[in-house]
Swiss-Prot record:
ATP binds at G63, K64, G65, G66, V67, G68, K69, S70. Heterotetramer of 2 Nubp1 and 2 Nubp2 chains. The keyword Iron-sulfur applies. GO terms for molecular function: 4 iron, 4 sulfur cluster binding; ATP binding; ATP-dependent FeS chaperone activity; iron-sulfur cluster binding; metal ion binding. This is Cytosolic Fe-S cluster assembly factor Nubp1 homolog. [4Fe-4S] cluster 2 binds at C241, C244. [4Fe-4S] cluster 1 binds at C9, C23, C26, C32. It comes from Drosophila grimshawi (Hawaiian fruit fly). Binds 4 [4Fe-4S] clusters per heterotetramer. Contains two stable clusters in the N-termini of Nubp1 and two labile, bridging clusters between subunits of the Nubp1-Nubp2 heterotetramer. The keyword Zinc-finger does not apply. Belongs to the Mrp/NBP35 ATP-binding proteins family. NUBP1/NBP35 subfamily. Its cofactor is [4Fe-4S] cluster. InterPro entries: Mrp/NBP35_ATP-bd, NUBP1/Nbp35, P-loop_NTPase, YlxH/NBP35. It is found in: Cytoplasm.
Length: 311
């Protein structure tokens, strides 16, 4: 029987497993440091079986919080579902401590039902479904105060016990940074024997350097985890005044913005989305604005075209 991991365990999938100072004194150190002795997490097989009919999984990541990653996830989902009506899309909200997709997709107050084949995700549109821990809380104001192992268990349940059915694309809305949730989902979904495009990532940022600093870390995280990066989306790139029509940079790109960073890190820039108050109001109300003609939807069209062409 394996002992519980130490507090600062790097994780069995890490290249540093069994080799860092936190591993000293752990009864499992010899197992973790020897690749021939590592035990496969039984959850991986359960996840693989449950996700066999999900063609593509797309992680929506951000280095910094507050850059609009969840909003971008919602906009991408809405636009893809509208422009590809014959395809099926799912959204998995794995921001365990801050689930926002139920509100953004207009599903607050919905309930998750259990069936013989597992949890049934909540239907948003004819070709969109959603699963979030927000559906399992008694109140939207409930705080989730969990350590890593419990988050890991919840993510494994979402991946292995939800009846996703046949999906062309599952978008996973993640928390900011590179934390337990990211390590868990990469461990369960990464399959080096699967087609390269079965799991990939998009990183969301804003133009200012304080956000780009953490995007560089996120890019390196993906590379270490062997997750292909489809590209970067620069959110809130500019603001056009509704009265005078002039455009302003709310977050000045002093170091060249996402374009310069993408060139430096050798990743594609998928496009830029403006700061649009109508998007904010629609997301708060859980409404779909992707049918409306605007700078935002024009930019979304170009971004979504690049996403779909990569699969």
């Amino acid at each position: 029987m394996q002992a519980p991991p130490p507090e600062h365990c790097p994780g069995v999938e890490s290249e540093q497993a069994g080799r860092v100072s936190a591993c000293a004194g752990c009864p499992n150190q010899s197992i973790c440091s020897d690749p021939t002795k590592k035990l496969e997490d039984p959850g991986k097989a359960l996840v693989a079986a449950a996700m066999k009919d999900v063609k593509h999984k797309l992680l929506i990541l951000s280095g910094k919080g507050g850059v609009g990653k969840s909003t971008v996830t919602t906009l991408l989902t809405r636009y893809l579902a509208r422009s590809c009506p014959d395809n099926n899309f799912g959204v998995l909200d794995i921001d365990i401590c801050g689930p926002s997709q139920p509100r953004l997709l207009g599903a607050l107050g919905e309930n998750v039902h259990q069936s013989g084949s597992g949890w049934s995700p909540v239907g948003i549109d004819d070709n969109v479904c959603l699963m979030s821990i927000g559906f399992l809380l008694s109140s939207v104001d409930d705080a989730i105060i969990w350590r890593g192992p419990k988050k890991n268990g919840m993510i494994r349940q979402f991946l292995s016990e939800v009846d996703w059915g046949n999906l062309d694309l599952l978008l996973l809305d993640t928390p900011p940074g590179t934390s337990d949730e990211h390590l868990s989902v990469c461990t369960y979904l990464r399959d080096d024997s699967a087609p390269k495009d079965s799991l990939s990532a998009i990183i969301v940022t804003t133009p200012q350097e304080v956000a780009l600093l953490d995007v560089r870390k996120e890019i390196n995280f993906c590379r270490k985890q062997r997750i292909p990066i489809l590209g970067v989306i620069e959110n809130m790139s500019s603001f056009r005044c509704g009265h005078c029509g002039n455009s302003s940079d709310i977050f000045p790109a002093k170091t060249g913005g996402a374009a310069a960073m993408c060139a430096e890190m050798e990743v594609p820039l998928l496009g830029s989305l403006p700061l649009d108050p109508r998007v904010t109001r629609a997301c708060d109300a859980g409404e779909d604005i992707t049918a409306m003609k605007s700078e935002t939807t024009d930019a979304l069209a170009a971004i979504c075209s690049k996403i779909m062409s990569s699969f």
